[in-house]
Regions:
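N-terminal targeting segments with Sec-dependent signals, encompassing both cleavable signal peptides
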Residues: 1-187, 191-217
Length: 217
C-alpha cells in the first residue's frame, strides 16, 4: 500500500494504471513511466516490447536501447546486444553503456577494445569485476586479484588460483553468494593444486551432479 502511495506521489499513476497503459496506450506515458512499466513484469518478451516502444517514443533517451541490449545479452544473443549498446552509446555514451560494450568485446575476445571501453566506465559498480576478467584474459593474474578486491565470485577465485593464492581462493569459494557447478569445479581445481585428493573427488562429484557437461573436463 505504501508503495502504491509513493508511486502516486512520484509518478502520479498507480502500478496497475502504468501496466495497462504500457500495453494499451503507451503514448499516454512519459519516458520514466514507460521505463518503470518494464520493471513491473518479469516476462522478457513484455519487457522487450515496452523498451522497444520507449525507443520509438523517446529516441533521444539511451536507457531503453541499453536495457534492450541487456535483455539480448541475457538471452545469449551477443550480436544483437552489441548493436543495441552501440545505439545507446550513439545517443549517450555513459559509463554504464561503455561497461556493457566492454563486456561484449571481452566475450568476443577483443581485449584491446574491452580495455578501451572499460577505461571510459569509471564509477560503475561492476568495473572491478570486469577489469579482473580482462586481466585474467591477458594473463595478468596479480592485477586481476587486485581488481577483484574482496569480491566473492567464481571469477575472483579463478584469479586467486591462477595467482597461486590458494588460501584466499578457498575462502572466496566458500563465500560465493550463489554457488553453482563452476564453484564446485573450481574447488576441485583448488584441491588438485593443493594435493587434496578428497576435495577433488567430492567437489567434482558435486559439480557433475549440477552440470553433467563438466564431466568432459
Amino acid at each position: 500500500r505504501s508503495r502504491l502511495t509513493l508511486n502516486y506521489e512520484i509518478i502520479g499513476k498507480s502500478d496497475e494504471e502504468i501496466t495497462k497503459l504500457a500495453s494499451s496506450n503507451p503514448s499516454e506515458l512519459n519516458v520514466e513511466e514507460l521505463l518503470y512499466a518494464a520493471t513491473l513484469t518479469s516476462d522478457p518478451a513484455k519487457q522487450e516490447a515496452i523498451y522497444t516502444q520507449a525507443t520509438k517514443q523517446f529516441p533521444n533517451d539511451y536507457r531503453a536501447f541499453n536495457n534492450l541490449g541487456k535483455l539480448a545479452y541475457q538471452a545469449g544473443n551477443v550480436d544483437k546486444a552489441e548493436s543495441y549498446f552501440k545505439k545507446a552509446a550513439s545517443v549517450n555514451a555513459t559509463p554504464e553503456v561503455n561497461m556493457n560494450l566492454g563486456l561484449i568485446s571481452l566475450m568476443k575476445g577483443d581485449k584491446a577494445a574491452a580495455e578501451a571501453y572499460f577505461g571510459k566506465a569509471a564509477g560503475t559498480k561492476e568495473l572491478g569485476e570486469s577489469m579482473g576478467n580482462l586481466y585474467i584474459a591477458q594473463g595478468q593474474y596479480e592485477r586481476a586479484v587486485n581488481s577483484f578486491g574482496d569480491s566473492k565470485t567464481n571469477s575472483a577465485a579463478l584469479a586467486q588460483i591462477l595467482a597461486k593464492d590458494y588460501n584466499k581462493a578457498k575462502n572466496t569459494l566458500a563465500n560465493v553468494t550463489r554457488p553453482d557447478a563452476y564453484t564446485d569445479y573450481l574447488m576441485a581445481v583448488l584441491g588438485a593444486r593443493t594435493n587434496n585428493s578428497s576435495m577433488v573427488t567430492s567437489s567434482l562429484k558435486s559439480a557433475v551432479a549440477k552440470d553433467s557437461s563438466l564431466a568432459k573436463k
